[in-house]
Structures are given as C-alpha cells and as structure tokens.
Amino acid sequence: MTAWRTLATQVLNGTPLSSSQALDVVHADDDEVLALLDAAFRVRRHHHGRRVRIHVLQNAKSGVCPEDCAFCSQSLKFDSDPEQYGMQQVDQIVEGAKAAWDKGAVTYCIVTATRGPHSSEVDVVCEATRRIKETYPMDVCASLGLLDAKQARKLADAGVDRYNHNLETSCDHFGNVVTTHEWSDRVETVKQAKAAGMEACCGGIIGLGEARADWVDLALALREIGVESVPVNFLNPRSGTPLEDVDTVRPQDCLKALAMFRLVHPEADLRMAGGREVVLDQMQPLALYAANSFFTDGYLTTGGQGESKDYRMIQQAGFEPVIVEDGPERQTPATADDTPSGDPEAADRRRQPSAGPAG
C-alpha cells in the first residue's frame, strides 16, 4: 500500500484508522518511511501545528519496586543495582518543579517506582501539587502505579491534571513481560484516573520482543480507552534485567510505529519517550513529524542528551517549543550542548538524583 496520504485524509475527515490499515503502516517497506511520516505530519500539523511540548520527569521514589516488569531496572527482583531512595519530601518535589519550569517544561511528571502508592505518598504528591500550582502554570502529571478510586479522586481534587500508567504492550504479549499483575489491572487504573477527572497518559514500549501486530493492538486498545496522551518508549536494555540482551528495534521501524500511533490517535499528545536518544539516534528529528512532545533532562535510570541539544533539535528541524508565558521568570535554556559528546552514557554519569523515568 503506497497511498499513505489517503489515510491521512480519511483520519482528518473523521474516519478512524482500521486495524488492517494500521498493520499496513507498520509493515510498510523502508522506502515508504518518508511517505508515512508525510501522512502522519498532515494529521499532526492539523491538530498541533509545528509545536513541541516539553515534559520533565521527577523520580520521586527510586529502585524499590516489588513488581517484575522485565524491562525495568528498578525492580527489586533483578540484579540491576539501581539507585535506591524512598519517597521524596514535598520540598524536594517542588524544587524539581522549579527546575522543570526553568527548562521550559509545560508538564511536570512526578513518578514513583512502586506497585501502587501508600496513602502517605498520595498525600505528599497532593501537597506538592498544590504548592506547585500556586507558583508555576504547568500541568502536573502523576505516575504512582496502580490506583483505586479514592486515591484517584484525591489526586484530581489536589489539582493533578494527568495520570500516567502505561499498558506497556498488547494484552496478548503482556504476560511475557510482567507476571506480578495483570494487563487488566493497568486498564482499570487508567479508567479510574479518567473517572476522577484526570486526563489519561498511557502508552507503551517498542522492543519488548513483541510482534508488530502487538503495536497495533496496543494503539487500538488505547483508542478504545480514550487516552489523551500517548508516550511511546523504545527499549534501551538495562543491565541485570531479563531483557538486557534484547536487540533494539531499528529506527526505521520505530518511525513506522510512531506514524501508526499518530494516525490512530490524531488528536493525542503523542510523545517520543525513553530510549529515543539511543534507538532513534540521528533520526530523532524525523520523529517530530509524528510526535508533538518529548521528555528532556533524562528518564528513570538513564540520562538524556541534554535540554540544550533537545531545543536545538527542535529549532533545526523547523519546529517550535511551546512556551508558557505567564508565571515566574525562568532561566533561558542554554544554547551550548551540555553533554559535549552527545553520548547518553555521559549524560548518565552526570545525571542528578531527580532525573526521572519515561512514561
């Protein structure tokens, strides 16, 4: 199938992409990648223009998760030796918000490594959110694991705008990656967040040993739930995890996946997330033709390429960062690359404890 622009027209006219059409996209020949991105960009430009939304993550509780997600070095079940610390204090989380604001973030994401939050941890996030909202006109996203209805309402009432809980992969493939909880548990948490009035941030990871059909199944499941934000991560294997020796997905195929996610989710905040620097490498700018958002300043257990290089990438590709004009004066992002080699491992070595996860 080569008439990719007809798919964009179909989507813009209000007819959702079908499963078979989505499969055609992810199975396209490499020669078709630019044509696919052109189709995805028509949809992206219609809903988001050339704007790019910057998100920053705060790893508020690290390395102490009891779950066995095979991709994650923060699990206590693996010999991955992550940095470990308990729940940060309110002041630390608010300080992280200031740093995110100075980096130009429009969304600040508070993340904990856990199955689900204790009531005291929910209280910390709620108080931090209230204080952040008093000063910084940023959206606040929380990612605290599995939620019940009471916890979801409490977070929403405190001003949390969006809740992140990724499905990670298709329902069929999930059991090959996680055994300590069910895919349906994650779906229920996302539904609880939406029922409480928060937007749903929910996506997955490319490269968990799944088939391309699993990418499509995940995208369609997210559409059925009605998520507003879709982070797409790319597995950057972590030492000591069961997936440490898995080959990364080719960048061409990652771009096909992003194009498919954009066509399935035309209005969503589509984010190229963890692993982009390593897996997409020099093809990152092309991803902006489908995605309208990304994280800067690192992830869960890996550093990024530096916000200076990220901003330069946006500008050189002909896009523009979304900047919130109101609020306190912020530091202008530096223009010089603060990781001279552009090496993500070098960024790892200089990563601060507040550097956060993908999601």
Swiss-Prot record:
**Residues at which [2Fe-2S] cluster binds:** C109, C141, C201, R271
Signal peptide range: none
Coiled-coil annotated spans: none
The UniProt GO MF terms for this protein read: 2 iron, 2 sulfur cluster binding; 4 iron, 4 sulfur cluster binding; biotin synthase activity; iron ion binding
| PROSITE patterns, per the entry | RADICAL_SAM
Q: What cofactor does its activity depend on?
A: [4Fe-4S] cluster; [2Fe-2S] cluster
- Known pathway: Cofactor biosynthesis; biotin biosynthesis; biotin from 7,8-diaminononanoate: step 2/2
Annotated keywords: 2Fe-2S, 4Fe-4S, Biotin biosynthesis, Iron, Iron-sulfur, Metal-binding, S-adenosyl-L-methionine, Transferase
Please cite one Gene Ontology biological process associated with this protein: biotin biosynthetic process
- Protein EC: 2.8.1.6
Q: Which residues form the Radical SAM core domain?
A: 47-276
Instruction: Enumerate the residues binding [4Fe-4S] cluster.
Output: C65, C69, C72
What InterPro entries does its record include? Aldolase_TIM, BATS_dom, Biotin_synth/BioAB, Biotin_synthase, Elp3/MiaA/NifB-like_rSAM, rSAM
Provide the cofactor note recorded for this chain's UniProt entry. Answer: Binds 1 [4Fe-4S] cluster. The cluster is coordinated with 3 cysteines and an exchangeable S-adenosyl-L-methionine. Binds 1 [2Fe-2S] cluster. The cluster is coordinated with 3 cysteines and 1 arginine.
The Swiss-Prot or TrEMBL record describes its family as follows: Belongs to the radical SAM superfamily. Biotin synthase family.
Role noted for this protein: Catalyzes the conversion of dethiobiotin (DTB) to biotin by the insertion of a sulfur atom into dethiobiotin via a radical-based mechanism.
Which PANTHER family does this chain map to? Answer: BIOTIN SYNTHASE (PTHR22976), BIOTIN SYNTHASE, MITOCHONDRIAL (PTHR22976:SF2)
What name does this protein carry? Biotin synthase
- Can you name the source organism? Salinibacter ruber (strain DSM 13855 / M31)
Q: What is the lineage of its organism?
A: Bacteria, Pseudomonadati, Rhodothermota, Rhodothermia, Rhodothermales
Gene field: bioB
